[in-house]
């Protein structure tokens, strides 16, 4: 065997090994699903479903809690706002707080303002520039519906009236005049939800 042949043989073997290594593909890892967040459940208010939510299977007298997320909109033309436990104070175990595990949520509560009446014009003054601002506050009747998150089934509905008590102590204005709708009262909503959340 010539010297030329001896040097070419190792080079050829290296080439074959490189080709073999290139042929072994590393499996691509499956993308990790993002954990559910509160805003994902808004679809249920629009008659959608959440496949990743656990099925709602109530057992009377079990003492088991079926967690909820709560949404509100002032009129049917508005976007839904998800309410945190600090802004809508249902019993603590009922709602998942921000940063909690929304993968446990079984129920979605959707509140929509269906009738509003002007209750008070609240005047405010900016201490810095003495500009005057006006807040028109409306008493509102809300339609409250509760859905099973996984199936999208409507489980029940009721109406509650949010009544005016006093002008807010302060308000963050974007315009010189704005409308504001009284928040739905917690107590009647809690009474309505009791049989679904804690049967």
Indicate where each model-derived feature is located.
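Compositionally biased, intrinsically disordered linkers/stalks adjacent to structured regions
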Residues: 31-102, 158, 164-199
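Well-ordered beta-strand positions in beta-sheet-rich domains
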Residues: 141, 157-159
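Bacterial signal peptide processing site
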Residues: 23-25
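Surface-exposed short loop/turn segments
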Residues: 101-149
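C-terminal motif of bacterial Sec signal peptides marking the signal peptidase cleavage site
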Residues: 18-21
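Bacterial N-terminal signal peptides that target proteins for export
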Residues: 2-11
């Amino acid at each position: 065997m010539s010297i030329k042949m001896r040097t070419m043989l190792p080079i050829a073997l290296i080439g074959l090994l490189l080709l073999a290594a290139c042929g072994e593909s590393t499996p691509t890892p499956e993308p990790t699903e993002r954990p559910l967040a509160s805003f994902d459940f808004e679809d249920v208010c629009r008659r959608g479903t959440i496949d990743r939510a656990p099925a709602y299977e109530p057992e009377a007298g079990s003492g088991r809690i079926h967690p909820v997320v709560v949404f509100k909109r002032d009129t049917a033309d508005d976007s839904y706002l998800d309410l945190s436990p600090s802004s809508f104070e249902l019993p603590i175990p009922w709602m998942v707080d921000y940063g909690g595990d929304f993968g446990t949520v079984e129920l979605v509560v959707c509140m929509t303002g269906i009738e509003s009446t002007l209750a008070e014009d609240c005047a405010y003054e900016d201490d810095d520039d003495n500009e005057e601002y006006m807040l028109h506050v409306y008493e509102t009747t809300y339609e409250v519906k509760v859905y099973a998150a996984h199936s999208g089934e409507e489980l029940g509905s009721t109406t509650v009236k949010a009544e005016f008590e006093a002008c807010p102590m302060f308000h963050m204005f974007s315009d010189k005049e704005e409308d504001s709708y009284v928040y739905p009262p917690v107590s009647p909503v809690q009474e309505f939800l009791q049989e679904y959340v804690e049967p």
